[in-house]
Amino acid sequence: MLAVGAMEGPRQSAFLLSSPPLAALHSMAEMKTPLYPAAYPPLPTGPPSSSSSSSSSSSPSPPLGSHNPGGLKPPAAGGLSSLGSPPQQLSAATPHGINDILSRPSMPVASGAALPSASPSGSSSSSSSSASATSASAAAAAAAAAAAAAASSPAGLLAGLPRFSSLSPPPPPPGLYFSPSAAAVAAVGRYPKPLAELPGRTPIFWPGVMQSPPWRDARLACTPHQGSILLDKDGKRKHTRPTFSGQQIFALEKTFEQTKYLAGPERARLAYSLGMTESQVKVWFQNRRTKWRKKHAAEMATAKKKQDSETERLKGTSENEEDDDDYNKPLDPNSDDEKITQLLKKHKSSGGSLLLHASEAEGSS
């Protein structure tokens, strides 16, 4: 039963000593009262002989004639004076013993408090029980101070935790998401292979952006960074018209022939396919519609003028045809007196000229 209890003691200390504050409190309790006080015989009041002290400190097993009712090894004199720590076999059973916790580098105060345990066996055997109690209380105070320092500082509590941030690559710069060229340069610097050759990785950018069509290079000529807003000689802001490539204008004209107005999604799709902004496509269509209206109005005016002139010409020919019909109709002297009178008045001048020519011809003859 005692052996089982001796094995359960390190297990309890292993669970209780998982955190530094609990370890310090448990060490204080163990320093004041040993784990199994009934198993150890009382120490003699007088100083023991040098032979017995040397034999007890050097031999790992108790002597044959010693009085040990439980069959356990009595603690060494140095173990009692070293901060009231448990025996060596109990602390060696688990890596979470009090000596291991106090000797950790993250708690310098506790490691300094464990220095009295390194005292030689001769001096520890000559000390009395009152001296061991005084050293135990001092060690308890040092352990409590170390626990308070560890609990107050977050670095002491988190010192033993692994840092997984060192495994991940550094975060990308902000310009990586706004400039494809900068993203490509950053990708070459961060990774040994290009992004397209990495297995199982989807491309970061759209394929149309990474491998652009021929007219996408003209985006550089349309960007406002090239000076859509310049300064005049007087220092005033001067707006310049952006220039488009022939392929862009050809695609815009073909789209304009199909439809004169674009909806929002159609404008966005056309702008992306041509490497232009939506505002540029919108302004181009507005200007193109204005030009088309002017041209259409001019064509309509020309067609109207041509139609009017043709109507007048047709009207004149119809009147002449009516006159010819009147002349070609036969006359009835009994019923067409009014018609004969109108024809004579209309052609009086022409008839007079004919009579004049006839009289001149007769006189010359």
Curated annotation (Swiss-Prot):
Give start-end positions of Basic and acidic residues composition bias. Answer: 305-318
Record region (Disordered): 35-136, 295-365
Region described as Involved in DNA-binding: spans on this chain: 307-365
User: Its domain of life?
Assistant: Eukaryota
Q: Which keywords fit this entry according to its UniProt record?
A: Developmental protein, DNA-binding, Homeobox, Methylation, Nucleus
Q: Which PROSITE patterns match?
A: HOMEOBOX_1, HOMEOBOX_2
What subcellular locations does the record give?
Nucleus
* GO BP of this protein: cellular response to cytokine stimulus; cellular response to peptide hormone stimulus; central nervous system neuron differentiation; endocrine pancreas development; negative regulation of oligodendrocyte differentiation; neuron differentiation; oligodendrocyte differentiation; pancreatic A cell differentiation
Q: Where is the composition biased (Low complexity)?
A: 48-92, 110-136
Query: Without the gene, what phenotype results?
Result: Embryonic development of mutant mice is normal until 13.5 dpc. At this stage, the normal expansion of pancreatic beta cells does not occur. At 18.5 dpc, the numbers of beta cells is dramatically decreased and the pancreatic insulin content is only 2% of wild-type. No effect on the production of other pancreatic hormones, including glucagon, somatostatin and pancreatic polypeptide (PP).
Q: Where is this region: Repressor domain?
A: 102-269
What InterPro entries does the annotation carry?
HD, HD_metazoa, Homeobox_CS, Homeobox_NK-like, Homeodomain-like_sf, HTH_motif
* Domain commentary: The C-terminal domain contributes to sequence-specific DNA-binding.
Briefly, what is this protein's role?
Transcription factor which binds to specific A/T-rich DNA sequences in the promoter regions of a number of genes. Required for the development of insulin-producing beta cells in the islets of Langerhans at the secondary transition. Involved in transcriptional regulation of the insulin gene. Together with NKX2-2 and IRX3, restricts the generation of motor neurons to the appropriate region of the neural tube. Belongs to the class II proteins of neuronal progenitor factors, which are induced by SHH signals.
Protein name (record): Homeobox protein Nkx-6.1
- Recorded source organism is Mus musculus (Mouse)
- The gene name reads Nkx6-1
